[in-house]
Amino acid sequence: MERRLILWLDEISKDLLPLVGGKAAGLGEMIKAGIPVPPGFVVTSEAYRRFVFETGIAGFIKHILEETIVSGRPEEYEKASELIRSKFVRTPMPPYLRRAIVDAYRKLGTLVGVEEPRVAVRSSATVEDLPEASFAGQQETYLNVKGEEEVVEKVKTAWASLWTARALSYRDSLNIDHETALMAVVVQKMVSSRSSGVMFTIHPVTGEEDKIVIESIWGLGEYIVGGKVTPDRFVVSKSDLEILEVRISRKDKALFYDPDLNENVEIKIPESGEELEDLRRKHPAVAEVVEKYGIRPDAPSLSEKEVKELARLAIKVENHFARPMDIEWAIDFELSPPENILLLQARPETVWSRKKEEAEAKPPEEEAVPEGEVLVRGVPASPGVASGRVKVALTVEEAAKKMEKGDVLVTKMTDPDWVPYMKMASAIVTDEGGMTAHAAIVARELGIPAVVGTGDATKKLKDGMLVTVDGSRGVVYAGAVKTEEAREEEARPELGAAVAEVLSEVYPVTATKIYMNLGHPEEIDRYKHLPFEGIGLMRIEFIISSWIGYHPMYLIEQGRGVYFIDKLAEGVAKVASAIYPRPVVVRFSDFKTNEYRRLKGGEKYETLDERNPMIGWRGVSRYIHPNYEPAFRLEVRAIKKVREEWGLKNVWVMFPFVRTTWELERALKIMEEEGLSRGRDFKVWIMVEVPSTVFLADEFAKMVDGFSIGSNDLTQLVLGVDRDSGFLAKMGYFDERDPAVLRSIEILIEKAHSQGATVSICGQGPSVYPELVEFLVRRGIDSISVNPDAVVRVRRQVASIERRIMLERLEELGSRLSRL
């Protein structure tokens, strides 16, 4: 079988990948999983190999590459590509290869009941869709191809597309040997697309695994991959297929097949009856489709039912391949629902699968939190921050003349031909496109910050302007918002990248999330490459005592409340930007009365003489009291500033020392009055330190998204032991492993999970007691947050425990089956 020239999609599996390429292997696997795919066949890589070796093209390619590509400049790639591709075009197809392709095309016509069916001819390179390398459109696709001779020529042209300048440059950037690159070609029945698009089973920008992102446009899908139209975007929850986010873009043009002209035509989507009549005069068949389906520039290109059906298919694809996937799809107006939804391609999502986002992103330092003038806003497409001089280029030729290393490339859109110039850029800004456009995908892979879909960047930004592009927030600022220290660190990206890459391979993935505790914002630079999923506890007390130094009520009295807000926001943003998009759970202040008194100006406001501040006026009881509520509002405003003004939506909050539901309800109301409310991207947690939160966990769970166990305080209050008493500790009373404490944790997890809330732990216990970690994992805790020095050790321990649990369950299952 390995030497066959033609294979049909329904006889292909991933085992034949070297013969059929990634695209075809993915299609074959989807067919096996019962997923709707247009019928077709594959001209295998064996046919390509015979063509290039029997005609002498292979030797010609080797000679051209050695002689032409010397320094890696874009012009060298262009010259080599032109020579090689013209050689393909001039070389006739050997008769036996032509016969094999024609016979398969005729058979496809018989299968679909059309003598000369319209087909899509798509490249399927043998390394194109592997997890290690996403070529995202590096080779060509030809749509609505009809007739035997045309199909044969397009197969040959698809083979030649293995040698475009962009493909050559891309393989070099990933150190892929050109001699190992082979090309298969997929020939499929053409879909008559009413709508088409791309979807990811992981959020392509934030890496959230519980979301599906669907982008769609009218007509054929080439305009979404090429970024020629800014697509509609739908974000769907995997758990219940609820549509979480909808963004309808203006889609003023589309590509449709015109049967009267037998070619694809670009149309202006009509907004009025007059424009529809004009379209009917030029392209009557296309106008009929536009009118029948209510196609308008501002109308949604998908119905709610279609969004959910696409999401359902996406989950089915991900489950079959057992990894996040990047999927192309189309809706055929010639078919009836639900058979009209067809999947055209599925390949492994590459960026988050390699876990290189943290290493490749360039997060701002403390001083680099953007405060400059906002010039342009768009869709955040590739995370990171970079500064440079603007070069506006509307064509590849213009980019070739203007671009220098480190420039900010500004253009209407970037298709695959732009890759050599994207590699030269420090950042990319486009007028059009969405987060799944080709430009966004490649920018993420290359680690280049990108903002797409701005609408007018090419008009607002001028050549030579110094700007800062924040790809995480979708904003372009005036000037270079960076420090020299940040520049020096970015000049040595290989250090952080190397550490992150090593860690991603050495330390295992766990079902139980491993978070890290952090108190000093400056420490994040030392620890950001550790293998943790987020900050499970960010204490702000250090920021207040060291960065601010004053009692917040004193600052309010002096009219300097904004100073408190800004400094607290800076400290939080430093951490959140450094690990974006991983979450940062910020705990509101939890000073005791005596600690607040030590702040400058504190004596005036902390007059309460408490014998035991540990269980006194602290936590939420302080936030809702008139004597401190104005200060709490400053904390809330700082969080709002970080999330809304600076776009760091990965910042969540946590209330400490919660005693009752009514006090939490009042604190949440204050937060809402300041413009912060729980939502899909804003989680609210509470600390579990007081036994009342354990017993009433099911009630608290209706008000919050998660719980975090403060095991030190919880142990103190469950056992009635002063945590600071060395005398009682020596007697063995203070022990987080005490059965009463463990039972409290068990009750909490059961009650929280029954209401859909998550449970974490941020106390010292897991860092000290391995047996406590095992207890927590076996009880189903969602995450464990530990100090930086324990992250690696606890992650390994959790992975080991989870493996043991899996083996135990398999043994139990085997035992049950043996008794049947």
Swiss-Prot record:
Keyword Kinase applies: yes
GO biological process, one term: gluconeogenesis
Cofactor: Mg(2+)
Known pathway: Carbohydrate biosynthesis; gluconeogenesis
Gene3D superfamilies from the UniProt entry: ATP-grasp fold, A domain, ATP-grasp fold, B domain, Phosphoenolpyruvate-binding domains, Phosphohistidine domain
Nucleotide-binding in keyword set: yes
GO molecular function annotation: ATP binding; metal ion binding; pyruvate, water dikinase activity
Keywords recorded for this protein, A-Z: ATP-binding, Kinase, Magnesium, Metal-binding, Nucleotide-binding, Transferase
Residues of the active site: H438 (tele-phosphohistidine intermediate), C762 (proton donor)
InterPro entries: ATP_grasp_subdomain_1, PEP-util_enz_mobile_dom, PEP_synth, PEP_util_AS, PEP_util_C, PEP_util_CS, Phosphohistidine_dom_sf, PPDK_AMP/ATP-bd
EC number per UniProt: 2.7.9.2
Enzyme class of the recorded protein, top EC level: transferase
NCBIfam families: PEP_synth, PRK06464.1
Job description of the protein: Catalyzes the phosphorylation of pyruvate to phosphoenolpyruvate.
Entry's family note: Belongs to the PEP-utilizing enzyme family.
Domains: entry comment: The N-terminal domain contains the ATP/Pi binding site, the central domain the pyrophosphate/phosphate carrier histidine, and the C-terminal domain the pyruvate binding site.
Protein name as it appears in the record: Phosphoenolpyruvate synthase
Provenance organism: Aeropyrum pernix (strain ATCC 700893 / DSM 11879 / JCM 9820 / NBRC 100138 / K1)
